[in-house]
Amino acid sequence: MSQQSRLANTFATARAEHRAALIGYLPAGYPDLAGSIATCRAMVESGCDIVEVGVAYSDPVMDGPTIQAAAEQALRGGVRVRDVFSVVEAITAAGGQAVVMSYWNPVLRYGVERFARDLAAAGGAGIITPNLIPEEADDWFIASATHNLDRIFLVAPSSTEERLVKTLEASRGFIYAASTMGVTGARDAVSSAAPALCARIRAHSDIPIGVGLGVRNGAQAAEIASYADGVIVGSALVSAAGEGLDAVRALTSELAEGVRSATVAS
């Protein structure tokens, strides 16, 4: 009855290699559209298993200053919602898996069914929806089922047990575990709340867990890879993208080494 997650093979491969999956992030259109395509390609070639392609949005309430500034630059450069599909196509062509990360408002404006259709046509695996809760996602449930797309919702240390269970039941592909409360951004120390949140998730579900918010180097990636199925890196890669492709390749390679060096929980 239920369709196979597009990302299931990616996580299964990583597990078979005794490592976590490396999940990168970049807004489409940063530093410009061609630059974002080249950057995402470099991420895949340097060890990213999955790339989250961000849809730049004018009111990014959950994003820290690095990602906000990148989104503003992309919007000033004239990026459109549909440009995200060009980036997704490039990631898929490079051999990576692409998911879109978007506030729900741009998807609603584009049209939920139309967005799902165009994302699937571009080879995308699903959507991460940071400000959408399952109770308000009826249109997305229908469209994601029609086009076999993964639904990746967020949970946080503050999520109640009831909220956690509801969100896990609604999710497919992986669950996005925000390891700290508050906005995104690279940090010196990774939150101690993340392992406890992962343990709570595993008490209810065997869905792969991606942990994000704060990773900026290989050592932190290794730390998270010891208890999570996926290590999500956003702000640090966006900062590297501002420096150029060599910086992106170097950081991605370091992170890819990190997720491989950890003693991974089986």
From Swiss-Prot:
SUPFAM superfamilies associated with the record: Ribulose-phoshate binding barrel
Keywords: Amino-acid biosynthesis, Aromatic amino acid biosynthesis, Lyase, Tryptophan biosynthesis
Name of the protein in its database record: Tryptophan synthase alpha chain
Pfam families associated with the record: Trp_syntA (PF00290)
Lineage of origin: Bacteria, Bacillati, Actinomycetota, Actinomycetes, Mycobacteriales
The family this protein is said to belong to: Belongs to the TrpA family.
Gene that specifies this protein: trpA
Active site: E52 (proton acceptor), D63 (proton acceptor)
Provenance organism: Nocardia farcinica (strain IFM 10152)
Pathway: Amino-acid biosynthesis; L-tryptophan biosynthesis; L-tryptophan from chorismate: step 5/5
